[in-house]
């Protein structure tokens, strides 16, 4: 085994019928970690059900079905390898909670792969005013996914087959709306593919010999290496807190920024509880330090389980410790809200691992969501498609940060009526100083 490949996360976006599952399934099938025996079993079942047409999509269908039945699937199934990278596919959209997952998601995507159905009629629907494609692209950009690869899929089904003029038409149209969203289309490779037949997915296709650019695999290899935020101060949102016999209290979560190591003194926001980290574990192995992206459990001394909750944030007590937000200002984009949102609206915010009702205290401005220019000061309300700056006040103690400083703690989904009705990016936070916070003996000793 050579040196471990760099890990990157990819989010696959596009209209429901664009062939996302087939394309993703194809990559995982050809380059992934799915056991041959599992594939044979799937193939046999697919054949029995006459599902041959879904040549690769069933790979994903099976994975999704198993996940929905609560069978935790080995995450390796959602991985595939390029020459340079080990790629993880983030929850393929189309899923009802996709938007929420993309925001609070356990991972920030390094690159978005936009799949477009090149056949006539369908392409127009996917990109029309209310098209999902546009919404997904806007969402990806707003949430800081700065790199994009665009696949013109189903080239085997254009009229005539593998039509260059069709491809050119799509490149022109998609470029213009990617530009409106905020991407630079000159930096976006447009790869003509067939996820079904396999053209230009991994090997070059003679059917598309008019195309001289990279295959999908090559385009993935050309993604810029992401910078990981290990040099920022520690911020680790808690997912759970366990009491483990013989060890004690073990909070669990994903390191978003910075590093955590044994011997460190940590402060938990929003309460300000401060204690020493005794040990750090990843997959039951003790580590000397854990880095951004690692899911860790860490043992803390003299702390009761009831003193910590999901949504609290562990931080370095000597370096920008996490504090309660008194209020914060965010740029909010309204997505699927049926009515009008005005001052006093109090939906639930999902931000990192916290899930707390927050009041829209003051809608300060309405802005053009593409240029950021102010359209109206102190508007009476915001409705679907609008964007604006809003001052928000949490109804319970919560930790948030600015998107610029700590991206995973600075983006949120607004949930109401069992769906995501808006997304936001935090621009500024006013913090409260903790009062009467408990500092354990272990922490005092370390001071």
Swiss-Prot record:
Region (G5): 194-196
Function, in words: This protein promotes the GTP-dependent binding of aminoacyl-tRNA to the A-site of ribosomes during protein biosynthesis.
Organism expressing this protein natively: Hordeum vulgare (Barley)
Residue(s) carrying N6,N6-dimethyllysine: 55
N6,N6,N6-trimethyllysine sites (modified residues): 79, 187, 306, 396
Pfam families: GTP-eEF1A_C (PF22594), GTP_EFTU (PF00009), GTP_EFTU_D2 (PF03144)
Region (G3): 91-94
Ranges for region G1: 14-21
Family annotation (PROSITE patterns): G_TR_1 (PS00301), G_TR_2 (PS51722)
One function term, GO molecular function aspect: GTPase activity
GO cellular component: cytoplasm
Family in the record: Belongs to the TRAFAC class translation factor GTPase superfamily. Classic translation factor GTPase family. EF-Tu/EF-1A subfamily.
Keywords linked to the UniProt accession: Cytoplasm, Elongation factor, GTP-binding, Methylation, Nucleotide-binding, Phosphoprotein, Protein biosynthesis
Annotated TM spans: none
Positions of region (G4): 153-156
Residue numbers bearing the 5-glutamyl glycerylphosphorylethanolamine modification: 289, 362
Annotated positions binding GTP: 14-21, 91-95, 153-156
Modified residues (N6-methyllysine): 261
Protein name, per record: Elongation factor 1-alpha
Subcellular location: Cytoplasm
Region (G2): 70-74
Domain tr-type G: 5-230
Domain of life: Eukaryota
């Amino acid at each position: 085994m050579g040196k471990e490949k760099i890990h990157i996360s990819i989010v696959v976006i596009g209209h429901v019928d664009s062939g996302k599952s087939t394309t993703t399934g194809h990559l995982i099938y050809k380059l992934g970690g799915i056991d041959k025996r599992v594939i044979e079993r799937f193939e046999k079942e697919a054949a029995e059900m006459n599902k041959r047409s879904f040549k690769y999509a069933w790979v994903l269908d099976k994975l999704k079905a198993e996940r929905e039945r609560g069978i935790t699937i080995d995450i390796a199934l959602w991985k595939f390898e390029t020459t340079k990278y080990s790629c993880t596919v983030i929850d393929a959209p189309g899923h009802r909670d996709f938007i929420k997952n993309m925001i609070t998601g356990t991972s920030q995507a390094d690159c978005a792969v936009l799949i477009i159905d090149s056949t006539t009629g369908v392409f127009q629907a996917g990109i029309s005013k209310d098209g999902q494609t546009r919404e997904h692209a806007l969402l990806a950009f707003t949430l800081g996914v700065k790199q994009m690869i665009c696949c013109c899929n189903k080239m085997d089904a254009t009229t005539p087959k593998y039509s260059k003029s069709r491809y050119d038409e799509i490149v022109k149209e998609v470029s213009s709306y990617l530009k409106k969203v905020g991407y630079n289309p000159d930096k976006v490779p447009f790869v003509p593919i067939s996820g079904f037949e396999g053209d230009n997915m991994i090997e070059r296709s003679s059917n598309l010999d008019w195309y001289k650019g990279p295959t999908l695999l090559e385009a993935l290899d050309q993604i810029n290496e992401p910078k990981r935020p290990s040099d920022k101060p520690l911020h680790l949102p808690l997912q759970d807190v366990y009491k483990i016999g013989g060890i004690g209290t073990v909070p669990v979560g994903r390191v978003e920024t910075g590093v955590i190591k044994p011997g460190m003194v940590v402060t938990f926001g929003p309460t300000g509880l401060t204690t020493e980290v005794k040990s750090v574990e990843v997959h039951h192995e003790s580590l000397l330090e854990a880095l951004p992206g690692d899911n860790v459990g860490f043992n803390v001394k003299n702390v009761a389980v009831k003193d910590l909750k999901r949504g609290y944030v562990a931080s370095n007590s000597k370096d920008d410790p996490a504090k309660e937000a008194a209020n914060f200002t965010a740029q909010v984009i309204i997505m699927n809200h049926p009515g009008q949102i005005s001052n006093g609206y109090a939906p639930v915010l999902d931000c990192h691992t916290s899930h707390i009702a927050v009041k829209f205290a003051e809608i300060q401005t309405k802005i053009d969501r593409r240029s950021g220019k102010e359209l109206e000061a102190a508007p009476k309300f915001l409705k679907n498609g609008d964007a604006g700056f809003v001052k928000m006040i949490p109804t319970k103690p919560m930790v948030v940060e600015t998107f610029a400083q700590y991206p995973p703690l600075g983006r949120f989904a607004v949930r109401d009526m069992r769906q995501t009705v808006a997304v936001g990016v935090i621009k500024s936070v006013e913090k409260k100083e903790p009062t009467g916070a408990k500092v354990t003996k272990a922490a005092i000793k370390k001071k």
